[in-house]
């Protein structure tokens, strides 16, 4: 599960392009928190601090304890605007955490894809989903979904129904979907095709 990140912010009452530029000259980044039926809160963050954390893996699924004027809020990053040249953070949207379940998008890590059975037989590992949307308990938010695909054979699909998710999480979509496939390259027979050919030759 994600370790909770502690951040401090300041509330802001001035808005617009001019106010945002003034904040950035002071080394701060404008931001906003919204969602969960609550009144939006406009804040500013220290530029160096938020840029440092943004550059770490899985920031967008990072649970954050945000302290604003001595009050604490549990939030998640929703969207980040970057400078087009320097990649310094220019604006951040956060969302308030829901009381029970939080819908969020997390990356998928396919462990062992280079040495999967189907790849060893000449197949190509095709990633269909690099990120998935989950419903998670607010106290059990994963950084990612890790799937061991070492034993995945050639010409097969990895479906959502086969995935064991972290405790307290479920897929947001109730419909089954494909996360990855191993595609057979031309000239490479799948196990089923090999068995069919062997049976045909035996019957001659």
From Swiss-Prot:
What are the GO MF terms of this UniProt record?
5S rRNA binding; structural constituent of ribosome
* One Pfam family from the record: Ribosomal_TL5_C
Q: Which UniProt keywords apply?
A: Ribonucleoprotein, Ribosomal protein, RNA-binding, rRNA-binding
Q: GO biological process annotations for this chain's record? A: translation
CDD domains, per this entry?
Ribosomal_L25_TL5_CTC (cd00495)
Q: Which SUPFAM superfamilies match?
A: Ribosomal protein L25-like
Q: What GO cellular component term, any one, is given?
A: cytosolic large ribosomal subunit
- Database matches in InterPro entries: Rbsml_bL25/Gln-tRNA_synth_N, Ribosomal_bL25/Gln-tRNA_synth, Ribosomal_bL25_b-dom, Ribosomal_bL25_C, Ribosomal_bL25_long, Ribosomal_bL25_short, Ribosomal_L25_dom, Ribosomal_uL5_bac-type
Subunit relationships? Part of the 50S ribosomal subunit; part of the 5S rRNA/L5/L18/L25 subcomplex. Contacts the 5S rRNA. Binds to the 5S rRNA independently of L5 and L18.
Purpose: This is one of the proteins that binds to the 5S RNA in the ribosome where it forms part of the central protuberance.
Concerning its family, UniProt says: Belongs to the bacterial ribosomal protein bL25 family. CTC subfamily.
Q: What is this protein called?
A: Large ribosomal subunit protein bL25
Organism expressing this protein natively: Rickettsia canadensis (strain McKiel)
